[in-house]
Amino acid sequence: MGMDERGEPGGAVKVGMIWGGIGGVVGLLVSLPGSLVGIVVAGFFGFSCGRRAAVAERRALSGLIGGAVAAPGYMLGSTLGALLTARLIGTAEIAATLSDVLGTQVSADEAWIYFLFSLVLSAMFEAVILISVSSAAGAWTNKE
């Protein structure tokens, strides 16, 4: 980030847009092994985004604004990464694994529905974590 962007109005939104684009790619790559990795990385990503947004705008809410703008891009990339992995694994394998874990028969269609529901929950957790950590990082950076 250049020196001319420090303290300018709208800087947190710009940072959020940039980090949202980066987050889409990062989210996709880190979620290929599974959604849990995407949830964990969302915290680190939110911290970086919040600090940069706070430097860009120097307002108390800049971390929150940057995180809220970046979160949808990260969530979309993360969800796409998990979907790609699930399609490679296949619904039959997911159903077999769920059947073994739950001790009951799960059809491929039911397994796919459970998987999609888990993606929605994962995306919500990622958004909450990313925005919360980004807000805290922004406040912490402005406090220094």
What kind of region is each of these model predictions?
Residues 1-144:
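Juxtamembrane/disordered regions of integral membrane proteins
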